[in-house]
Structures are given as C-alpha cells and as structure tokens.
Amino acid sequence: VHWSAEEKQLITGLWGKVNVAQCGGEALARLLIVYPWTQRFFSSFGNLSSPSAILGNPMVRAHGKKVLTSFGDAVKNMDNIKNTFAQLSELHCDKLHVDPENFRLLGDILIIVLAAHFAKDFTPECQAAWEKLVRVVAHALARKYH
C-alpha cells in the first residue's frame, strides 16, 4: 500500500487528538448496538441486554480501548500493517473464529466516531485517508482467513 505524505499527515494529525479510551469504548459499544450479532463474541462481558447496558459496561469500554490502542499500531506502522497485525489476525481467525466482515464493520463505525468527535478536522480528504487506513487494517486482520 502506498501512502502519500498528505495521507500520512492527515491520519497522524488526527490520531494525535484521539482519546483512545473514550473513542475506543464508544466505537466498540456502537458496533455491539448497531450490529447486535457481533455480541456473540463478547458473551463473557456480562450485561449486553440494551444500548444503555452496553454503553455502561466497563468491559466493553476496556476492550474498546484495547482495540483502538492496537489500531494505533497501524498508525505508527503504516508501511508495515500486514506484519503488524499478523498475530491478531491469527488469534481472531484460529481461536476466536470472528467473521472477517466484522473488521470492516468496526472500521465503518470508527469513521463515524472520528467524524462525530472531530467534525471540523474531519474533512473529505481526511475521511478518504482514514477510509483507506481502516480498509487496509481490516484486510490485514482478515489475512489469515485467505
């Protein structure tokens, strides 16, 4: 994947403003609410019975932070995303059996969360760069499935 200097700047510039705990928790909660079938991967998280239960669930927030922290590794290693996510791809494929389509859905949700938090900075050019990044990350996570 080739990244232009402008794409890298748009991604790293916005990433520097992201509150990983807040945006990560919100992104995972949105995923579980908007796409309820994804909840089956999180049965150990306790109460996921309603949107308010999901939004208030500390395990959802903690795992969302973990997910977005790991996404930060993509931002730091934009020229080597495939290798950066090799182990996570293996885990999600072989052990957790996550449908790789869910990675794309989470990427879409992350775009919405970033746009909501950074409306002024989230220009069409910025969105295009982030859309490319979430596609590349989703593809890297799905790599073990191919």
Swiss-Prot record:
Signal sequence range: none
GO molecular function, one term: haptoglobin binding
InterPro entries cross-referenced by the UniProt entry: Globin (IPR000971), Globin-like_sf (IPR009050), Globin/Proto (IPR012292), Hemoglobin_b (IPR002337), Hemoglobin_oxygen_transport (IPR050056)
Gene3D superfamilies to which the protein is assigned, alphabetical: Globins
Organism domain of life: Eukaryota
Summary of the tissues where the protein is detected: Red blood cells.
GO cellular component: blood microparticle; haptoglobin-hemoglobin complex; hemoglobin complex
Record carries keyword GTP-binding: no
Pfam families given in the database record: Globin
Residue sites binding heme b per the record: H63, H92
Annotated Globin domain residues: 2-146
Keyword Heme part of the UniProt annotation: yes
One of the GO BP terms on file: hydrogen peroxide catabolic process
Keywords: Heme, Iron, Metal-binding, Oxygen transport, Transport
PANTHER family to which the protein is assigned, alphabetical: HEMOGLOBIN FAMILY MEMBER, HEMOGLOBIN SUBUNIT EPSILON
The family this protein is said to belong to: Belongs to the globin family.
Quaternary structure, from the entry: Heterotetramer of two alpha chains and two beta chains.
Role summary: Involved in oxygen transport from the lung to the various peripheral tissues.
Protein known as: Hemoglobin subunit beta
Source species of the chain: Eudyptes chrysocome
Lineage: Eukaryota, Metazoa, Chordata, Craniata, Vertebrata
